[in-house]
Design a protein with these regions (language model features):
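Midchain, well-structured core segments that form catalytic/ion-binding scaffolds
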Residues: 1-145
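An extended, acidic, His-containing surface patch that forms the Zn2+-binding/catalytic region
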Residues: 104-306
């Protein structure tokens, strides 16, 4: 008679996660051509249970985030991931469940909206930072053993760049066929109404030398200081408010934006070039996944992943 602890243990969810992680990493070289600024990142929220014993771990999770300039490129990458998941599950005596966290479409531009928005930005001027903000910024530089600067903020924050000039700078870095770059969730709105994205300078410190990068906490620290962060919010709100007033008071501006939207979408919402939402109509919000839990203890404020 053989003791249960002496028999071979079946592979389980940790093996599945490891195989999926490593094999998909290797397959990245073959998923798509090396062009288009696409990225594929992964995160392991769950890998087994609390302790190791002779029972095969029953659950593991692996989350992927894909950014690419076209939807077919995204689909090609996820086709590879789907096949890998199916084969890994078969190899490890597991079942696989696939679920979306979110899916977004590529953005639909609207030059008419961009023009009226930038016109207001020009009238209002770029944000400016007072001495109180600069004092805090210099203190941050000093805490990093840097020589505090007379003007610690990146000089480009107070200069306005026309959207067509910014577009040209982006295009210089991209292949000619690529129309979209990076990712955000606001882009889904662009398929339902004329939309413009507004970039306003966020407090950023001037680098002491080429190639230097401040740690992330510096950016977050300035985000909690009104003197540093308020110029961005205040200027953005002023530009948005004046743009809305223009659209409400001048019907020709609104009609121009709506006409461009209809043209780009092939007739508007539901048109020949319109892209429908990528998530199904019965999609349930992904609220059941693990998030850090913040708690107050006698030792102070802590967090844990339950």
């Amino acid at each position: 008679m053989t003791h249960a602890h002496a028999i071979a243990r079946a592979p389980g969810a940790i093996d599945a996660v490891c195989l999926m992680y490593t094999n998909s990493k290797m397959m990245k070289e073959s998923m798509l051509r090396h062009a288009g600024s696409w990225t594929l990142n992964e995160f392991i929220p769950i890998a087994g249970q609390a302790a190791a014993d002779n029972i095969a771990p029953a659950i593991g999770q692996l989350q992927y985030a894909m950014r690419a300039p076209t939807l077919p490129m995204c689909q090609a990458a996820f086709d590879v991931l789907d096949r890998n998941a199916d084969h890994v599950a078969a190899m490890t005596h597991c079942t696989v469940t696939k679920a979306w966290i979110t899916r977004t479409r590529a953005g639909l531009p609207n030059h008419a909206m961009a023009e009226v928005t930038f016109h207001n930005f020009e009238q209002l001027g770029a944000p400016e930072w007072a001495e109180e903000a600069k004092v805090f910024a210099r203190a941050l530089q000093k805490s990093l053993a840097l020589e505090p600067m007379q003007e610690p903020f990146f000089e480009g924050l107070t200069k306005l760049t026309p959207p067509w000039e910014a577009e040209k700078a982006f295009r210089a870095q991209l292949p000619a066929w690529q129309l979209n770059y990076a990712a955000d969730d606001y882009v889904d709105y662009t398929w339902h109404a004329p939309t413009v994205r507004l970039y306003v300078g966020r407090p950023t410190l001037q680098a002491p030398k080429s190639g230097y990068r401040y740690p992330e906490w510096v950016r977050h620290a300035m985000g909690g200081v009104p003197a540093c962060i308020d110029p961005m919010w205040s200027k953005a709100s002023a530009v948005i408010a004046t743009t809305l007033i223009d659209l409400l008071s001048d019907p020709s501006l609104l009609e121009k934006a709506q006409a461009e939207f209809r043209d780009r979408a092939g007739g508007g919402v539901g048109g020949s070039k319109w892209v429908a939402p990528l998530l199904p109509a019965d999609f349930e919000a992904p609220i059941g996944y693990r998030w850090p839990e913040y708690v107050d203890t006698p030792r102070g404020r802590e967090w844990t992943v339950p």
